[in-house]
Amino acid sequence: GATVSWETFVEPLEDVTEQLSRAWGIVGHLSGVADTPELRAVYNENLPLVTQFWTEVGQNRALYEQYQALHDAPDFDALPPARRRTIELALQRFKLGGVELQSPARERFMAISERQAALGQKFSENVLDATDAFELIVADPAELDGLPADALAAARQSAQADGKEGYKLTLHFPSYFPVMQYANRRELRESLYRAYVTRASENALAPADPVAREALDNTAIIDELMALRQEEASLLGY
C-alpha cells in the first residue's frame, strides 16, 4: 500500500474529527452556561453516542497502526517538533484508550467509558441545580459594604424579580465573585464561600428541603467514578 504520511493521514483524520469536536464542544458549553430541561434532555440523549464514537476511535487498531508507522518511519526525527509531539501523544491516547485490549476486556473498557461519561454529566447537572437552589436575602445594605454599585443594583433587581425586599445574593459567578472580592464583612464572604464549596455534597446548604438536597449529593457519584477509574487503570495494566 501507499506509504502513510502526515498529509495523507493525520490532516484528513483531524479535519474529520475536529468537526465533531467543535460542534459537540459548543453543545457542551451551552449545557453548562444556558441549561434548560430541553437542552439537558438532548445532551443526555446524544452523550452516549459521542462517547461511543470516541471510545471506538481510541480502540481502532488500524488507526493506531498508521500512527505507529509514522512514528517508526526513518524520517520521523526530521519532522517539525510539533508534528512529532502530536504523533507521540496520539499513540499515548490510543494505549490509554484500550487499543491493545482483547475481548472481553475491550468491551468492559467501553462500558466503563460510557458509564463515566454519564456519571460526569450527572455530576455537572447536580452542581448546576445546587447552584440554582441557593440564595441569600440581605435586608440591610450596610451588610453589603464594599460592593460596587453595579453589583448592589444587580442584587436589588434579583430580589425584586422574585417579589422580595432587600438584596438577593446567589452562587452564580456574577453575584458570587463581587462579594468574595469586594465585600468588607468577613462573615458574609465566609457564608457565601461555604455555600459555594459544599454545593452538591453531603454538607451542602441548599436546597433547603433535605430530600431535594440529598438527591443532588455527588458523594456516591464520586465513589463510583473512583472505582471505575481504578478498574480502568487495572485493565490497562497499571
Please tell me what each predicted stretch does.
Residues 1-238:
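Zn2+-dependent metallopeptidase catalytic domains
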